[in-house]
Structure formats: C-alpha cells, structure tokens
Regions:
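Anion-binding alpha/beta catalytic cores of soluble intermediary-metabolism enzymes, centered on
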Residues: 1-84, 90-187
Length: 187
C-alpha cells in the first residue's frame, strides 16, 4: 500500500499512547538550545508522514487527523515571538496538506492540552520537542501510557519512562506502563 511504502522510508517517530491521547515527538533527546535548528520543514514533514502512515498501518486509523504544537510561546503570534512557526512549521503543514495529510496547527502549546481536554481528541498530537509534549502527556496518562515507535518494520513498544534506577530493587514500581507496552499496539 502507499501508506506502507512511505512508512518504510521515513525516520521513526516516538509515539506515546494512553487512553484518550496519542502524542508523537518530532525531535527526541535534543538539548533545548538546539531544538530550533533541529525543527526543519523536512524533519516536520517526515514526522507527519511517518505518524500518519504508522497510525494507519499499526492502529488501523484511516486518514488520521494530526495536530501540531507550535515551537514558540503562543505559536509565535504571527512572527512577533520568533519566526519558526511562520517560516518552518506552517510551510511544513501546508506541504503535508498538499500530500493529502489531515493536519492542523501550529497550536500554542501552553493551553493546548487544557483546551482539548474535554473535546474529542485528534488521532495524534505532534510535539516539536521532548518536554513540550511529555510533561503534559505524563500528567494526563498517570502511569497508564506506553511508547510505541512508528516507522519500524516490526512493532516496538516500551514503558513511557526511563530506567527508574532510583526505585530499582525496592518493590515500589508501578507496572501499569509495562502492562500497556506489552499489549499489542493495535488497540
């Protein structure tokens, strides 16, 4: 299929899943001072393609809707607070739309999750960097989420947290994220 052809050519996307939310990352473990340079039209377009193809191939969501968060406060306010959302994010979204993807944004990230808490969620939200998305996601999921890597030739899931060395061997770990990761990603 066309979706699987695109899926095999793109860089993987870390998708975090919990009941009521799927959140992907355009960049992963990039220092904050380097995030702006890492957000390019190609990087964002590739993440959008991989996310859309993965949602279709792995989760059976035809024609998924993807929301994209802005980089700067208030999604740059039309270039008044940095220009990345105007110069990089908007053109990448337009390009994705011309390819037939259903994308919207950039949305100001400071109020996005509160604003959409009581509305039907999109099929996925793309955060541009790690803490922009994972802070709100972890508040939302309360230990019930997992990480599902999109764009690989085999399914890959994991807990949505790090190694937790601080609690290792103390019998206090919460297994809900591991349980979510073990379930098939086609839920």
């Amino acid at each position: 299929s066309a979706a699987s052809d695109v899926y095999k050519r793109q860089a993987p996307v870390m998708m975090f899943e919990a009941p009521g939310m799927r959140l992907g990352l355009v960049t992963i473990h990039v220092p904050l001072r380097k995030v702006s340079d890492a957000i390019t039209p190609d990087a964002l377009a590739n993440a959008l393609r991989t996310t859309a193809a993965g949602l279709t191939a792995d989760l059976g969501i035809p024609d998924p809707v993807i929301h994209v968060l802005g980089l700067n406060p208030h999604a740059s306010e039309d270039g008044r607070i940095g220009d990345e959302d105007v110069v990089v994010v908007r053109p990448a979204l337009e390009r994705a739309r011309t390819e037939g993807l259903r994308v919207a944004g950039p949305f100001p990230s400071d109020g996005y999750f509160a604003r959409y808490r009581d509305r039907p969620p999109p099929d996925a939200v793309l955060a541009l960097y790690h803490d922009q998305g994972l802070g709100p996601f972890k508040l939302w999921e309360r230990g019930r989420g997992c990480q599902h890597t999109l764009g690989l030739s085999v399914p890959r899931t994991s807990c949505d947290h790090g190694t937790a060395y601080d609690i290792a061997g103390r019998a206090i770990a919460d297994a809900r994220s591991m349980t979510a990761a073990i379930r098939p990603p086609t839920r």
